[in-house]
Curated annotation (Swiss-Prot):
It is found in: Plastid, Chloroplast. This is Small ribosomal subunit protein uS11c. It comes from the Eukaryota. The keyword Transport does not apply. Residues 1-23 are annotated as: Disordered. One of its GO terms (biological process) is translation. PROSITE patterns: RIBOSOMAL_S11.
Length: 138
């Protein structure tokens, strides 16, 4: 019986380094999406292709702890650690959402050593669009 041809790039043949880490990205965009329940940090190149991402949930926080500022700080540090190794020096920051993690994530991004060209708040604001949900009665 003939031997099966080993598949290139599969986990079974022991290739450890990923193909994405070979790209050098000098400039990128950091998207922070801070809701009341979670904070998601996505790092893309200038064309919008995702390089790295992290969230408070993937960092090990569960339940209501995902919405805390410390969880957002951890998620931002986790997402940026990989792209600094790939050579990112400059970045634009887009912050979306009303959550507690906005400022903490921005503080973690500033501390990472990446030069920020600008910080923009891209939270969607309705011009009196849909009717909001009724008030909670607890």
């Amino acid at each position: 019986m003939a031997k099966p041809i080993p598949r290139i790039g599969s986990r079974r043949n022991g290739r450890i380094s990923s193909r994405k880490s070979t790209r050098r990205i000098p400039k990128g965009v950091i998207h922070v999406q801070a809701s009341f329940n979670n904070t998601i940090v996505t790092v893309t190149d200038v064309r919008g292709r995702v390089i790295s991402w992290s969230s408070a949930g993937t960092c090990g926080f569960k339940g209501t702890r995902r919405g805390t500022p410390f969880a957002a700080q951890t998620a931002a540090g986790n997402a940026i650690r990989g792209v600094v190794d790939q050579g990112m020096q400059r970045a634009e920051v887009m912050i979306k959402g009303p959550g507690l993690g906005r400022d903490a994530a921005l503080r973690a991004i500033r501390r990472s050593g990446i030069l920020l060209s600008f910080i923009r708040d891209v939270t969607p604001m309705p011009h009196n669009g849909c009717r909001p949900p009724k008030k909670r009665r607890v």
